[in-house]
C-alpha cells in the first residue's frame, strides 16, 4: 500500500518539452490511490492536451481563473488549501522565476502563492539555463521558503546537448515524494512486531484445542502500523485474514503456541522497537498428541493438559528498551484483571476488551476497548470499527513513547 493513498495532489504543468512526461506521472499518482487535480499554464497547452490529462486524472483540467463559457470561477485559494501536496512538473526557468518573485499572472502561479502545504518542483530546462546564476538564485529562494527541489537528471536535452537539466523521470518523482511522505510518518523506521489470530493445539491428526479469535484486530493493527511508516512483522496463527495491498508487511504463519513462542522470541531481540501481542494464545496444550485419530469408544474421555510457555511474561522479563503491549479479554472484574496482567508481565500498556460489551470481542468487525498503562493512566473508548480501534491503539502508543 502506498503512503500516498487518499492524498490530494495538485499537479502544475508548465510550458516545457518535458510536459509530455507528466502524463505518466499523473497516471502513477492515480494508481497509488491519489486524487489528482491538474492546473496547466497557458503555454503548457502547446506541449500536451487537457483532454489527455483529464482522462488520466479523472478530473477537469484548469488553466484560467474562470470559464469563459459558464462563468465558473476557479478559486485559487480553495484549490491550494484543498491539496496535501503541490507538484510543479515540469518547472521551467520562467515559472521558477515567477514563483521566486511572487508573480501571479495565471491560475497556476496564484494557486502556488496561496499554498500552505508542501510544494515540490522538478526543474526542466537546458544545461546553460539550469546553471545560470539567476536561475540558481531562484531555486535557492524557493528552497529557503520551504519548497522542495526534485533534482534534474543529467542526459540528453531538448537542444541536443548533454548535461544537467533533464526533468526527473515520473517514477523517480513518485519515489521521491513517497519517501518524503514516509519520513514524516510517526512510526517511520520503527520496527513493530505484532501477533494475531488463535493458536491450535493438536490432540490427534484431526482435532485440536483452539479459540474463536478471527485475527481481525491484529491484522488491522498491522495494516495501520504500515500506513504510519513502520517496518512490520506479523506473526499470525491460523486464520483467513488477508494482507492484500500490504506487500511490505512480513507475515509469518504459525499453528501452535510453541511455534508462536519460537517465532516471537526469534524476532524480539532483532532491534524490535514495539511489540503488540494481539494473538489469543492457548494457555494449555495436550500432554501427549495421538499419532492416530482417537476413537469414541468410551462414554467419557480424559485429556491431560500441560501449561504452555507464557510468551508475554518472558518478553516482559527480558525487556530492554522495547515498548511492550498486551491484550486482555475479560468476562468479569475487567479492569482489575487487566491491571494485574499489566503489572505481573512488566508491560508498558494493555488493551482491555470485555465479552460483556455488545459488538466487541471475537469475530466482530467492531470492538470496544479500554487502554491502561504502567503509569496509572486509563483511556476509555466507545464501540468502533476495528480499523479505527487500531488507529487509536497506535496513537496511544506514540503518545506514551513521546512522554
Ranges and model annotations:
Residues 1-120, 126-329, 333-403:
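A cross-family phosphate/adenosyl-ligand binding-site feature
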